[in-house]
Curated annotation (Swiss-Prot):
Localisation per UniProt entry: Cell membrane
Name assigned to this protein: A-type ATP synthase subunit A
Reaction it catalyzes: ATP + H2O + 4 H(+)(in) = ADP + phosphate + 5 H(+)(out)
Keywords: ATP synthesis, ATP-binding, Cell membrane, Hydrogen ion transport, Ion transport, Membrane, Nucleotide-binding, Translocase, Transport
E.C. number: 7.1.2.2
Organism: Archaeoglobus fulgidus (strain ATCC 49558 / DSM 4304 / JCM 9628 / NBRC 100126 / VC-16)
Subunit structure: Has multiple subunits with at least A(3), B(3), C, D, E, F, H, I and proteolipid K(x).
Membrane topology annotation: Peripheral membrane protein
Organism lineage: Archaea, Methanobacteriati, Methanobacteriota, Archaeoglobi, Archaeoglobales
Sequence positions that bind ATP: 234-241
Broad EC category: translocase
GO terms assigned for molecular function: ATP binding; proton-transporting ATP synthase activity, rotational mechanism; proton-transporting ATPase activity, rotational mechanism
Gene Ontology biological process terms, A to Z: proton motive force-driven plasma membrane ATP synthesis
Length: 581
């Protein structure tokens, strides 16, 4: 970060926590500055008369009025190129392994580290020839970054259209020139992009393909589309982070960007320990081979939380521009909103609801609206799916962050503390949650899974809804007072809840459930439901029906790698015991 000519150096007038007020400094909004003798990284967030307001992304202890402030004249940008995958960054794209080498286990202040390794060499294979015309965003070659991910090297979207004068093949570092345009523009393996500016695309496409997560309650009842937005609000201990980890592990995106924003450091450690060992069900390679981590834990500087969210989404858009499906997990957007509230307080702005700034809704929308399935500048189709966790204090969904998030996102997975207390995981409340993608995705499920999928889904939801209606009566007078047919319905609902909805995140087989297996299980439960009613008509008592032999074997079949024989044997046993030969 070189500093420009005179006028780009000023001095500190006042300091208030992470907010520094400087004077005598030429600056524009969102310019990157170096504050104090140690050159702490900061960003211009306001201009009042001759004074410049800077939020500092590092601890401001020891900085004093009169210290110099330098403006780099550049906005906060990330480096996009080979070397992103498998890396773990802080909120402003400094690689944490590099910072550890420089300053030990605790990050020192004012340390600069490039986002991409300058020494690593990458094998570049050109896809265009000398004399060919290239447009912004076009793919000019590839680099095999990991066994799973082939990085496509793009003409930066902010470069003018031109003709290739020279293009080279071979091993290069990210700083080496790999192609030259006729107007003299040099293209490298990487380019920089300002984090607050969404990357351009040709057009947005309708979200008609589901993001398969391998979690039964999500895929069957509340699916999210590729290029969609989802929120997971829930009180502490209800399983937000485990659900996010499950999505990062098993969703059928080609790239996963995981942002730990203001949450516990141990949760990021868990990702770092587990992902290299876990196998991707589609490629058979470690999950880390497709993951980028942005860690900004709760004990890191507050201001950098905002940067980490923008850094993560910009990296996701870069992979989208190559034609990949990207899933981005932000855990948790509430911590980012709290950071905004703190900075807003320091800026002495008029507070909105619960002390959050008035622009909370527009900032959240700015982030979620960068999701989408698009036609890229290169003509490919890529998508960014955003899943944001929200941590409302005390599990109160009426607080501003949750409410503003719900206005923007189309899928709401409501985590319920009562379900978590009953050890029902994933603790997603099937009565409160919703997905607005169900109608747009039903054709995909009908074509790729079964024509009956949507009918089965509707039937199961009706059973669960009916159970909730009967639950009030049951709690008052007990289930014995109900007619037999309704008691059968309660039994079927129990099977749906305990066999289908409960899923074990730490069981090697049950942690991921393919869509075909989900369909087979739901169809089998519908079959059992039909047999129950037939047995009731044939004169069997409710106790005989509920205690029929074979139900336990059926419940255990989902834990088998090859589940079909076990499930069929259990179904046959249930049929014989209920209806005879």
């Amino acid at each position: 970060m070189e500093v420009k000519e005179a006028g780009y150096v000023g001095e500190i007038y006042r300091i208030s926590g992470p907010l520094v007020v400087a004077e005598g400094l030429k600056a524009r909004m969102y310019d990157l500055c170096k504050v104090g003798e140690e050159g702490l990284m900061g960003e211009v967030v306001g201009l009042v008369g001759q004074k410049v307001l800077i939020q500092v992304y590092e601890d401001t202890e020891g900085v004093k009025p009169g210290d110099k402030v330098e403006n780099t004249g550049m906005p906060l940008s990330v480096e996009l190129g080979p070397g992103l995958i498998r890396n773990i960054y802080d909120g402003v794209q400094r690689p944490l392994p590099v910072l550890k080498e420089v300053s030990g286990d605790f990050i020192g202040r004012g340390i600069e580290a490039p986002g991409l390794d300058r020494k690593a060499k990458w094998e570049f294979k050109p896809l265009v020839k000398k004399g060919e015309k290239v447009k912004p965003g076009e793919i000019i070659g590839t680099v095999q970054e990991t066994e799973v991910v082939e990085q496509k090297i793009l003409v930066p979207p902010n470069v003018k259209e031109g003709v290739i004068a020279e293009i080279y093949e071979g091993s290069f570092t990210v700083e080496d020139t790999i192609a030259v345009l006729e107007d003299g523009t040099e293209l490298k393996l990487y380019h920089k992009w300002p984090v607050r500016i969404p990357r351009p695309y040709v057009e947005k496409l309708p979200p008609v393909v589901p993001l398969i997560t391998g979690q039964r309650i999500l895929d069957t009842f509340f699916p999210v589309a590729k290029g969609g937005t989802a929120a997971i609000p829930g009180p502490f201990g209800s399983g937000k982070t485990v659900t996010q980890h499950q999505l990062a592990k098993w969703s059928d995106a080609q790239i996963v960007v995981y942002i730990g924003c203001g949450e516990r450091g141990n949760e990021m450690t868990e990702v770092l320990e587990e992902f290299p060992e876990l196998e991707d069900p589609r490629t058979g390679k470690p999950l880390m081979e497709r993951t980028v981590l942005v860690a900004n834990t709760s004990n890191m500087p507050v201001a950098a939380r905002e940067a980490s969210v923008y850094t993560g989404i910009t990296i996701a858009e870069y992979f989208r521009d190559m034609g990949y499906d990207v899933a981005i997990q932000a855990d948790s957007t509430s911590r980012w909103a709290e950071a905004m509230r703190e900075i807003s307080g320091r800026l002495e702005e008029m507070p909105g609801e619960e002390g959050y700034p008035a622009y909370l809704a527009s900032r959240l929308a700015e982030f979620y609206e960068r999701a989408g399935r698009v036609k890229t500048l290169a003509g490919n189709i890529g998508s960014v799916t955003v899943v944001g966790a929200v941590s409302p204090p005390g599990g109160d969904f009426s607080e501003p962050v949750t409410q503003n998030t719900l206005r923007i996102v189309k899928v709401f997975w409501a985590l319920d503390a009562k379900l978590a207390a009953r050890r029902h995981f994933p603790a997603i409340n099937w009565l409160q949650s919703y997905s607005l993608y169900v109608d747009t995705l039903k054709d995909w499920f009908a074509e790729n899974v079964s024509e009956e999928w949507n009918e089965l889904r509707r039937w199961a939801m009706e059973v669960l809804q009916e159970e909730a209606n009967l639950q009030e009566i049951v709690q008052l007078v007990g289930s014995d007072a109900l007619p037999e047919s309704q008691r059968v319905l309660l039994e079927v609902a129990r099977i749906i809840r305990e066999v289908y909805l409960i899923q074990y995140a730490y069981h090697p087989v049950d942690t991921y459930c393919s869509v075909q297996k989900q369909y087979d299980m739901l169809k089998a439960i519908k079959q059992i439901n039909d047999w129950f009613y037939q047995a009731l008509e044939a004169g069997k008592t409710i106790d005989e029906i509920a205690g029929v032999e074979g139900l336990e074997e059926f419940a255990r079949a989902k834990f088998e790698e090859d589940y079909k024989p076990a499930m069929e044997a259990a179904l046959e046993k249930i049929r014989k015991n209920l209806l005879g030969e």
